[in-house]
UniProtKB/Swiss-Prot annotation:
Designated gene of the protein: lafU
Source species of the chain: Escherichia coli O44:H18 (strain 042 / EAEC)
Role noted for this protein: Part of the flagellar gene cluster Flag-2. However, the Flag-2 flagellar system could be inactive in strain 042 due to a frameshift in lfgC.
Compartment(s) of residence: Cell inner membrane
Protein name: Putative flagellar export/assembly protein LafU
Family: Belongs to the MotB family.
CDD domains reported for this sequence: OmpA_C-like
UniProt keyword list: Cell inner membrane, Cell membrane, Membrane, Transmembrane, Transmembrane helix
Length: 307
């Protein structure tokens, strides 16, 4: 007997079911990370620029920049922007590194020249003091004269005593004996290349009116001394400064009205002292400030290498 299967079973089709799992991908990132990265890059650039500026300028220039940022005035005519100092019109040439032996030799030469200049200056000031003392002795003014060698130069004090006054009381009219002394001193001061400062001092006796006071009197007396020196042949460019101190620097503070407080001081400056004054008042700034800074930098490098 022929087997006949179930037609329904024979005619049925096999259905294959495929299950597909869909993965949800994260959405696209926004542009916030670009902003953060740009801020980070800008901050790093500012940091590197600051480090470069600090490394490019010298110590004195850094102090000038700091003073300018704080609104302070600086003696060498400051007001220059730091960019003017570190951004030259032409790119700087690459620095050549000198051999240690050459650097040390140059440092020794500088130290030797500085020592010779100091020795020469001290010798000249000593000879000047001897000449001034001789002139004062011949004029019988030993009691009116004092001299002192200080780091800035030779300090010459010509003062009143109980017997003689250099000027008429309360006036800038110079007395004959003091004029004679200044005339004798003029060629002595002119014999050296050193500049001089003339300063007037008074005692503490006050004026009755405020129109003319001890400031005016001390300044006028210093100017009178300068005028006599120049009339005696001393060049006018020999005087670097004329100043008035009134009664601010009394020699005899216990006796403010003492005659010894009334005096004229003549300071014969060393070369370094006059250079410092040029620096303070802004003249010859490039010729004075930069060499001093370079000299100090070289001395610092030399001291670090010898440690």
């Amino acid at each position: 007997m022929r087997k006949t299967g179930n037609r329904r079973e024979r005619g049925a089709k096999t259905t294959i079911v495929r299950r597909q799992i869909k993965k949800n991908h994260a959405g696209h990132h926004g542009g916030a990370w670009k902003v953060a990265f740009a801020d980070f890059t800008l901050a790093m650039m500012a940091l590197f620029m600051t480090l470069w500026i600090v490394n490019s300028v010298s110590k004195s220039e850094r102090e000038s920049i700091i003073a300018a940022l704080h609104g302070q005035s600086i003696f060498n005519g400051g007001g220059l922007s730091p960019l003017n100092k570190i951004s030259p019109s032409h790119p700087p040439k690459p620095a050549t590194v000198a051999a240690p032996e050459e650097t040390e030799k140059k440092a020794r030469d500088v130290n030797e020249k500085t020592a010779l200049l100091k020795k020469k200056s001290a010798t000249e000031l000593g000879e000047l003091a001897t000449s001034i003392n001789t002139i004062a002795r011949d004029a019988h003014m030993e009691a009116n004269l004092e001299m002192e060698i200080v780091p800035q130069g030779l300090r010459v004090l010509i003062k009143d005593d109980q017997n003689r006054n250099m000027f008429e009381r309360g006036s800038a009219q110079i007395m004959p004996f003091f004029k004679t002394l200044l005339v004798e001193l003029a060629p002595v001061f002119d014999s050296l290349d050193n500049k001089i400062i003339i300063t007037g001092h008074t005692d503490a006796m006050a004026y009755k009116n405020n129109i003319y006071n001890n400031w005016n009197l001390s300044g006028d007396r210093a100017l009178s001394a300068r005028r006599v020196l120049e009339e005696a042949g001393m060049p006018e460019d020999k005087v670097m400064q004329v100043s008035a101190m009134a009664d601010q620097m009394l020699l005899d503070a216990k006796n403010p009205q003492s005659a010894g407080n009334r005096r004229i001081e003549i300071m014969v400056l060393t070369k370094s002292a006059s250079d410092t004054l040029y620096q303070y008042f802004g003249q010859h700034g490039d010729k004075v400030v930069q060499p001093l800074v370079q000299k100090l930098d070289k001395q610092q490098v030399h001291s670090q290498r010898t440690r």
